[in-house]
UniProtKB/Swiss-Prot annotation:
Belongs to the PAL/histidase family. The gene is hutH. Contains an active site 4-methylidene-imidazol-5-one (MIO), which is formed autocatalytically by cyclization and dehydration of residues Ala-Ser-Gly. It comes from the Bacteria. CDD domains: PAL-HAL. Its main location: cytoplasm. There is a cross-link at A145-G147 (5-imidazolinone (Ala-Gly)). GO terms for cellular component: cytoplasm. InterPro entries: Aromatic_Lyase (IPR001106), Fumarase/histidase_N (IPR024083), HutH (IPR005921), L-Aspartase-like (IPR008948), Phe/His_NH3-lyase_AS (IPR022313). Its EC number is 4.3.1.3. This is Histidine ammonia-lyase.
């Protein structure tokens, strides 16, 4: 997949840019204007170091130690020691795409020119991204204020030639990884250490990728529901645009319209005799999926602001030579948003699992064989995939409990309220994985039901779905290892190109 380079300006980054850099290796460039702003703000910091003017994190200690004066000669040690002491994350390492997203967002903050870092700091971030030096970053340890200190410190370690990093697929010492890539460690001064580790790029980087996945899962959920409509010969009156215009939530209107497009041309819909309405899991898809769609759209708006925001502290304003301490590092906007996203995405799986149950249950599936298998008894068919889906949605109910309602004091009670935003973001990555599996099971189950129903002519979109599914997964005629089928279905819906192809077919 060929992707365009991403030019970092400090204010124009998109969610799509983050995905391109994090997952597709897009080249990163720093704009000329950004380079100038970085130099201008660094001069202000240099003046403070020389003068000894009391300024947080430059001529003072950190947190509760902010009353301790730091001399000019101690400044370099202050910045280096900050990194060494704060690199205490634990747990499994973040995957490569998340680390790359984090690095890009930290670079974008520096590009704004309000961080006061040495130009070599953003330069090495650019080089590490482009040459594939990926720091080993433990996933746990952030309180979400003052930002993501512990996690970001592990990235900073590699930048100064410490810590560990991956290079060409191998984990090695950070200094060795830099050397193999032809890079040299940076020497920190001024406000560099604080400028690297203070802020919200970890929770925002995770969130940006999770948002992209959520948007694709929403499409996959609508597609899965459309195929279930085919299997149940669903009644499309509930999708009538007049109903949805009378309750004009955008997500609801868009969902109903999309499913109608998916089903256009189908010969199976609206063919049940003596029945005028479907159960809620079909009839209310626009209302349920639509509510998730609106929540996801809100999350995009928040993240588009945050990934272009300056979440460092203190901030340097070169125009009037001011350096001001504030609280932009506090992750509450992202914490609440990630919790919201988790709830919205979880609900897509909740209703999907109920459709799966309705498909396999002989008392509910409208005359299809029990568990969608002929010669049941000796064959169990799709009995246990529904168990798996039920297990995953139940796990998500635990994961969807909000992290942002929690707080705990730290740093001698100086930092007496925190966001837990990175915990919220980490949870959504697990929720997304679980939802993707549930939707894969729904696609697989719905395709089996359609074959057993004997659908003669599919809709524009559902027909494309069936062709894609059956290209990789044959109809189940006797028991086999369904794990393999689920993994194939998972691969199908995880591929953005497949989702886009079906979406285009339904237009």
């Amino acid at each position: 997949m060929k992707v365009k380079p991403v030019t970092v300006t400090g204010s124009s980054l998109t969610i799509e840019d983050v995905v391109a850099v994090a997952r597709h290796g897009a080249e990163v460039k720093l704009s000329a204007d950004a380079k100038k702003r970085i130099k201008d703000s660094k001069k202000i910091v240099d003046d403070i170091v020389k003068s000894g003017k009391p300024t947080y994190g430059i001529s003072t200690g950190f947190g509760e130690l902010s009353t301790v004066t730091i001399t000019k000669d101690q400044n370099g040690a202050l910045q280096r020691n900050l990194i060494l002491s704060h690199a205490c994350g634990v747990g499994n390492p973040f995957p490569e795409d998340i680390v790359r997203a984090i690095m890009l967002l930290r670079l974008n903050t520096h590009a704004s020119g309000f961080s006061g870092v040495t130009p070599s700091v953003p330069d090495i971030l650019v080089d590490m991204l482009n040459k594939g030096v990926i720091p080993y970053v433990p996933e746990k340890g952030s309180l979400g204020a003052s930002g993501d200190l512990a996690n970001l410190a592990h990235i900073a370690l590699v930048m100064i030639g410490e810590g560990k990093a991956y290079y060409e697929g191998k984990l090695m010492e950070g200094k060795a990884a830099l050397a193999k890539a032809g890079l040299k460690p940076v020497v920190l001064s001024g406000k560099d250490g604080l400028g690297i580790i203070n802020g919200t790029p970890v929770m925002s980087g995770i969130g940006a990728l999770a948002l992209h996945d959520a948007e694709q899962l929403l499409k996959a959920a609508n597609m899965g529901a459309s195929l279930v409509f085919e299997a149940f010969r669903g009644i499309t009156a509930a999708l009538d645009p007049r109903i949805h215009k009378s309750r004009p939530h955008k997500g609801q209107i868009d969902t109903a319209a999309f499913i109608l497009k998916m089903l256009k041309g189908s010969s199976s819909i609206n063919t049940r005799e003596n029945d005028v309405q479907d159960p809620y899991t079909l009839r209310c898809v626009p209302q349920v999926h639509g509510a998730s769609a609106d929540a996801i759209a809100y999350v995009r708006k928040v993240l588009e602001i945050e990934i272009n925001a300056v979440t460092d502290n203190p901030l340097v304003f070169p125009d009037n030579h001011d350096v001001i301490s504030g609280g932009n590092f506090h992750g509450q906007p992202i914490a609440i948003t990630m919790d919201f996203l988790g709830i919205a995405v979880s609900e897509l799986a909740n209703i999907s699992e109920r459709r799966i149950e309705r498909l396999v249950n002989p008392q509910l599936n409208g005359g299809l064989p029990a568990f969608l298998i002929e010669n049941g008894g000796v064959n169990s068919g799709f009995m246990i995939p529904q168990y798996t889906a039920a297990s995953l949605v139940s796990e998500n109910k635990v994961l969807a409990h909000p992290a942002s309602v929690d707080s705990i004091t730290s740093s001698g009670n100086k930092e007496d309220h925190v966001s837990m935003g990175t915990t919220a973001a980490r949870k959504i990555t697990e929720i997304v994985k679980n939802v993707r599996h549930v939707l894969a099971i729904e696609w697989l189950t719905a395709a089996q039901a359609c074959d057993l129903r004997g659908v003669k002519k599919y809709g524009k979109g559902t027909g494309e779905m069936m062709k894609l599914i059956r290209k990789h997964i044959s109809k189940v005629t006797e028991d086999r290892i369904l794990y393999n089928d689920i993994m194939k279905a998972l691969e199908i819906i995880s591929n953005d190109e497949n989702i886009d192809m079906i979406e285009n077919a339904a237009k």
